[in-house]
Amino acid sequence: MDLTPREKDKLLIFTAGLVAERRLARGVKLNYPEAMAYISAALLEGARDGQTVAELMHYGTTLLSRDQVMEGIAEMIPEIQVEATFPDGTKLVTVHQPIA
């Protein structure tokens, strides 16, 4: 399998997102990379499913709460930016204060 660097990045985000999802299911609080991967993977999948940038910007704020991440993690992530592929091209999705 010959993947481009962008495809490798997406695969890494997706894999890390799955690890984070499994840890959440077990009740484990997420650390910084896990929280970033969890939200980023959900945004990439939402774009692939046809959601708009505005919908994803809102959706990104509903994925994790402070109770689901380690202490101090919410403050470490003031925003998340993901370059996602939509049906009409690639766009930057920015989610402000993703962990409420």
Curated annotation (Swiss-Prot):
GO biological process terms on file: urea catabolic process
Keyword annotations from UniProtKB, A to Z: Cytoplasm, Hydrolase
First-listed, main subcellular location of the protein, grouped into a coarse class: cytoplasm
CDD domains per the UniProt record, alphabetical: Urease_gamma
Annotated coiled-coil segments of the chain: none
GO function terms (MF aspect): nickel cation binding; urease activity
Keyword NADP: no
Gene3D superfamilies xref list: Urease, gamma-like subunit (3.30.280.10)
Localization: Cytoplasm
Protein family (similarity comment): Belongs to the urease gamma subunit family.
HAMAP family: Urease_gamma
Subunit description: Heterotrimer of UreA (gamma), UreB (beta) and UreC (alpha) subunits. Three heterotrimers associate to form the active enzyme.
Protein name per its UniProtKB record: Urease subunit gamma
Species in which this protein is naturally found: Pseudomonas savastanoi pv. phaseolicola (strain 1448A / Race 6)
Gene responsible for this protein: ureA
